[in-house]
């Protein structure tokens, strides 16, 4: 199974940002942990991070043309307003999971709305970095 993991704006600063919201795990450790988990699950995991909306759209279009079995995406702040990322995700027929480290519905009002959620199959929010592992496990359980 081939899964694309996309992390959006500011996620490369995990470990430097507000630990009460995002925990203390840094980005490199998160990716290393997820790659190990994916290997145990016999999953081919490609990880991508960008602070640029267009780069994320380009990566999604590339993945569409190459073919992937599933997408896990944490768009960061793009969650709340990026119709470009939403539209790029919408063309996929594979499973798509939106992940958020913090509980976006218990934060500032502007964070409560996700324009991404309607084009995803599942939203995981508020489980910390464990949410990424839950997404991987779920995708393996539904046996794409």
Predicted region positions:
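Short glycine-rich anion-binding loops that position phosphate/pyrophosphate groups of nucleotides
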Residues: 9-11, 76-79, 102-104
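Extreme N-terminal starter segment of soluble prokaryotic enzymes
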Residues: 1-4
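N-terminal small/polar loop signature for handling phosphorylated ligands or for N-terminal nucleophile
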Residues: 49-71, 77-80, 84-93
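Glycine- and acidic-residue-enriched helix-capping/strand-helix junction motifs
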Residues: 14-28
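Short, structured coil segments at secondary-structure junctions
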Residues: 41, 92, 118-119
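Short, glycine-/small-residue-rich phosphate/pyrophosphate-handling segment
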Residues: 47, 106-144
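Short beta-strand elements in bilobed, periplasmic/extracellular small-molecule ligand-binding domains
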Residues: 35-48
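Short, acidic/small-residue loops that bind anionic groups at enzyme active sites
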Residues: 91-107
């Amino acid at each position: 199974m081939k899964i694309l993991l996309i992390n959006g704006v500011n996620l490369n600063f995990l470990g430097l940002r507000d630990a009460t919201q995002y925990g203390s795990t840094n980005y490199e450790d998160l990716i290393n942990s997820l790659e190990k988990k994916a290997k145990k699950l016999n999953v081919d995991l490609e990880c991508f991070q960008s602070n640029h909306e267009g780069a994320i759209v380009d990566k999604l279009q590339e993945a569409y043309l190459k073919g992937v079995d599933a997408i896990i995406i944490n768009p960061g702040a793009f969650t709340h307003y990026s119709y470009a990322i939403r539209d790029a995700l919408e063309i996929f027929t594979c499973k798509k999971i939106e992940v958020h480290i913090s509980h976006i519905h218990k934060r500032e009002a502007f964070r409560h709305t996700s324009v991404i959620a309607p084009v995803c199959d599942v939203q995981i929010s508020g489980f910390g970095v464990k949410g990424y592992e839950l997404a991987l496990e779920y995708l393996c359980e539904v046996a794409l």
